[in-house]
């Protein structure tokens, strides 16, 4: 029974780590130094 509980916690920790990692990377890309390379397609479009 102990093995199943340990596997569950390991899976939960892995999923939380991946979620926080992707969220952190997204925030870094949106607001960090790489954000200077992003372009706004609505600003580029001329009517």
Swiss-Prot record:
Pfam families: PsbN. GO terms for biological process: photosynthesis. The keyword Membrane applies. It is found in: Cellular thylakoid membrane. The chain crosses the membrane at residues 9-31. InterPro entries: PSII_PsbN. This is Protein PsbN. It comes from Prochlorococcus marinus (strain MIT 9303). The gene is psbN.
């Amino acid at each position: 029974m102990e093995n199943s509980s340990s596997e569950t916690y390991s899976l939960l920790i892995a999923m939380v780590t991946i979620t926080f990692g992707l969220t952190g990377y997204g925030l870094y890309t949106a607001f960090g130094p790489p954000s200077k390379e992003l372009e706004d397609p609505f600003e580029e479009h001329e009517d």
